Amino acid sequence: MKLENQLIDRLNIGKNRYGHGVRVDSDTTKWGTPANSWVEMAREELLDAIIYIVADYIRNHEDPRVISEPDDNKRILEYANNIERIKNPSHKLQIWNLTNLLHSQLFTGDQRTF
């Protein structure tokens, strides 16, 4: 599916869920960001993407959770912080890409030009 179609689908989901499309002048703190910033909103979404991709990796490529553990948060953090432990190259690449995006100047606030 083309990127444009995927974006339209996501915009429609938001419109149906919230009753309107994206309003760029909206205060993002109403949706939980600490600052009124669409970049902050994107940063949170990238962090969520890392969590979801690691969760998918664990589900499909590692042993199931020990029943005594209430969730997989600790395992997710272990893999996210040590991507060399991720054996599947597709999962590893996506985590690497997302991590590098989060370290880019747009998300770090570093306004120097390179």
Predicted regions and their residues:
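Intrinsically disordered, low-complexity regulatory regions
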Residues: 1-114
